[in-house]
From Swiss-Prot:
This is Tabinhibitin 2. Expressed in salivary glands. Keywords: Cell adhesion impairing toxin, Hemostasis impairing toxin, Platelet aggregation inhibiting toxin, Secreted, Signal, Toxin. It comes from Tabanus yao (Horsefly). Transmembrane segments: none annotated.
Length: 255
């Protein structure tokens, strides 16, 4: 019965996502300063995209790969691995089509860093990670995804309890931004996009993932517990140290 209810919840959420995407006028959403919204205006490739730019569809096998890798590391850390504290209420991350569409729009600029805002009506402070790839030729999409995830996973050597308790994007041993964002207990959803293009003799790609929330400087990455998921209403059946996908966590609240 529980699994049926969870399935219905996820289906309803997916229907709501598509309805939201079609209804929102991103040009009307507030942006700080003089920045523009990435979802506003025509969805065209930027001049920086060189020759033959193409946005690649992420298939179910790709989105499943992204979600499984993120949830694997969340589940691993939630139980206190890598010398990090246990997480009291970290939930399973799900795919979000609106975040994915905005991530795709971002990749069509062919620049990892832009000043465009990406907030939505549901997610006021979304986080973002970018992975750039340059080589003589591009690998398969799955290999690009795996390379991006590996880059973030290697930051386990840099992250510490002190960073979990009071976030900074760099530890004594290096950058932790990618891994720390994947571990935020306010992150409930993710959506990614991928664009490739030719830059002279080099093939290039930009993979962007938008997260439903972002870490706040000197605030906890996640709430610490005495046992994994001790504050969960219900644990996930697969990722047993995480809350289920139906856990009512507000991505817009801060720790």
């Amino acid at each position: 019965m529980i699994s049926i209810l969870v399935s219905r919840f996820l289906l309803a959420a997916l229907v709501l996502q598509y309805a939201t995407i079609d209804a929102v006028n991103y040009c009307n959403l507030p942006c700080r300063g003089d920045r523009f919204h990435v979802g506003c205006g025509e969805s065209a490739f930027a001049q920086e995209c060189g020759e033959s730019p193409e946005t690649l569809d992420l298939l179910k096998e790709h989105t499943d790969e992204i979600l499984s890798k993120i949830n694997d590391v969340r589940d691993h850390v939630a139980k206190g691995s890598w010398g990090l504290p246990m997480a009291a209420r970290m939930k399973v991350v799900v795919w979000d089509e609106e975040l994915a569409r905005l991530a795709t729009r971002h990749t069509k600029g062919c620049l990892a860093e832009t000043h465009a805002c990406r907030n939505t009506e549901r997610f006021l402070f979304p986080g973002q990670l970018n992975f750039e790839y340059t080589d003589d030729k591009l690998p398969q999409t799955k290999e690009l995804i795996d390379a991006a995830i590996k880059k973030g996973h290697l930051q386990k050597h840099n992250i510490s309890r002190e960073i979990i308790e009071s976030y900074k994007d760099n530890g004594p041993d290096g950058d932790v931004e990618e891994l720390a964002l994947a571990l935020s207990d306010r992150v409930t959803a993710v959506g990614c996009g991928l664009t490739t293009w030719q830059d002279g003799a080099k093939a290039r790609a930009l993979l962007t993932c938008n997260f439903s929330s972002q870490n706040i400087w000197e605030r906890p990455v996640y709430k610490i517990g005495n046992s994994p998921g001790e504050k969960c209403i219900e644990k996930d059946e697969t990722y047993k140290n995480l809350c289920s996908a139906s856990e009512p966590i507000d991505s817009n609240e801060s720790n």
